[in-house]
Amino acid sequence: IDGLHEYDQVKRDILNSIKFLNKGGLILCHDSLPAEYSEQTVPYTFGTWLGDVWKVIVEFRTYAYLDICVCTIDHGVSVIKVNKNSNLLKIENLNGKLNQQILSFGLRKN
């Protein structure tokens, strides 16, 4: 999946793909690891743009039925498999807001 680069569309693309995925099949999702803050801003402003694809990957890592690994190649390629999550991510909810350290993981503001 390498489409619109925006959270809502990427999430929709992955969920739709899961419906038709063969048993044991994999979904690959490109642009999962922005290196700079400017690479993940929506809407696109300038330069290299990965969008906020990474947010979908973080969210799906909290799902018990999706096993995900992220390869640190070509701006991040996430491998998604419908399977028991071998590394379930638990996000602590602090006063109704997601922990900003989790949301900004891997990003550096310029």
Residue ranges and their predicted role:
Residues 4-110:
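A short alpha-helical cap/connector motif
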Residues 1:
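Redox-cofactor binding/interface segments in oxidoreductases and associated redox assembly factors
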